[in-house]
Amino acid sequence: MSITKDQIIEAVAAMSVMDVVELISAMEEKFGVSAAAAVAVAAGPAEAAEEKTEFDVILKGIGANKVAVIKAVRGATGLGLKEAKDLVESAPAALKEGVSKDDAEALKKSLEEAGAEVEVK
């Protein structure tokens, strides 16, 4: 009489952690394989979920106070008056690209205080 997969799973589920570790070691030795390879493959997708380090600040809208938004854009980007005005009027537009999270959040806060609608991507 052979043992079914369900019986094996139930037996492993009833084992202590130390017993499972010993079982894995014995299986590695018996079949000449390593359980570490399976762990490395499973860990691969987790690396893709790294936290983003560079952000883009997008001006979505200028709100009611266009002059204040232009001043805020000039201060943040170092553009001249005409360039800043053109950028603000072309919203939605990227203000800064590839900046750190802290810089992006600070820029977003200053522009929102001026009345702009801003998105950080």
From Swiss-Prot:
Share an example GO biological-process annotation for this protein.
Answer: translation
Q: Could you name the domain of life of the organism this protein comes from?
A: Bacteria
Tell me the function of this protein: Forms part of the ribosomal stalk which helps the ribosome interact with GTP-bound translation factors. Is thus essential for accurate translation.
Family membership noted in the UniProt record: Belongs to the bacterial ribosomal protein bL12 family.
Which InterPro entries does the UniProt entry name for this protein?
A: Ribosomal_bL12, Ribosomal_bL12_C, Ribosomal_bL12_C/ClpS-like, Ribosomal_bL12_oligo, Ribosomal_bL12_oligo_N_sf
UniProt name for this protein:
Large ribosomal subunit protein bL12
What are the alphabetically sorted keywords of the record? Ribonucleoprotein, Ribosomal protein
Extract one GO molecular function annotation from the record. structural constituent of ribosome
Any single Pfam family the record assigns to this protein: Ribosomal_L12
| Gene Ontology terms: cellular component | cytosolic large ribosomal subunit
Query: Does this entry carry the keyword Ribonucleoprotein?
Result: yes
Q: How does this protein assemble? A: Homodimer. Part of the ribosomal stalk of the 50S ribosomal subunit. Forms a multimeric L10(L12)X complex, where L10 forms an elongated spine to which 2 to 4 L12 dimers bind in a sequential fashion. Binds GTP-bound translation factors.
